[in-house]
């Protein structure tokens, strides 16, 4: 299945299917162990009120990055699915470029290195310049061959609207998730 076909599905399906995939930005990255799905029809999504300059990439083609700044501090990375929907990358198990990620994050703790969307962004060197870039274009590298469709699920973190939806997915038993399920 092509990347475009993989991401041309509902974000809830994609978020679950990304668990176990390998994702790298340049030489740094690891195994995706936690994701959250967002859809334009639910009020927690940045796209709920329609396209804006900030969320324009969420309405672009599937298999592209949507990068936004959270709390004015952290760059967060989403993978665009169907128009107005995407998957937030919440946590990775670091496997490559560990020293570089430790330098960027100013920590040596592997468990905390990419545990949470802001930490993922900082460790991978994510910034606004990557917004709208295709996931098949450098510096991105996404390998879906190890992805598992056996993810555990729970409610999303840090939201107040549509908080009851179990659209957070994780790799069962992983110590690298941002919060236990």
Swiss-Prot record:
Keywords: DNA damage, DNA repair, Hydrolase. It holds the Pfam family Pur_DNA_glyco. HAMAP family: 3MGH. The keyword DNA repair applies. Coiled coil: none annotated. Belongs to the DNA glycosylase MPG family. GO terms for molecular function: alkylbase DNA N-glycosylase activity; DNA binding. The keyword tRNA processing does not apply. Its EC number is 3.2.2.-. The lineage of its organism: Bacteria, Pseudomonadati, Pseudomonadota, Alphaproteobacteria, Hyphomicrobiales. InterPro entries: Formyl_transferase-like_C_sf, MPG, MPG_sf. This is Putative 3-methyladenine DNA glycosylase. CDD domains: AAG. GO terms for biological process: base-excision repair. PANTHER family: DNA-3-METHYLADENINE GLYCOSYLASE.
């Amino acid at each position: 299945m092509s990347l475009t076909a993989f991401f041309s599905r509902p974000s809830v399906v994609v978020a679950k299917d990304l668990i176990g995939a390998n994702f790298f930005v340049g030489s740094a990255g690891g195994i995706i162990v936690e994701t959250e799905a967002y859809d334009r029809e639910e009020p927690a999504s940045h796209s709920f009120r329609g396209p804006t300059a900030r969320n324009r990439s969420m309405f672009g083609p599937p298999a592209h990055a949507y990068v936004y700044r959270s709390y004015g501090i952290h760059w967060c990375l989403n993978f665009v699915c169907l128009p107005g929907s995407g998957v937030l990358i919440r946590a990775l198990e670091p496997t490559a470029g560990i020293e570089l990620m430790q330098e960027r994050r100013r920590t040596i703790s592997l468990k905390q290195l990419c545990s949470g969307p802001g930490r993922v962004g900082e460790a991978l060197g994510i910034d606004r310049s990557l917004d709208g870039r295709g996931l098949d274009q450098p510096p991105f590298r996404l390998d879906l061959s190890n992805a598992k469709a056996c993810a555990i699920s729970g409610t999303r973190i840090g939201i107040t609207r549509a908080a009851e939806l179990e659209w957070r997915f994780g790799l069962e038993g992983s110590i690298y998730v941002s919060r236990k399920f």
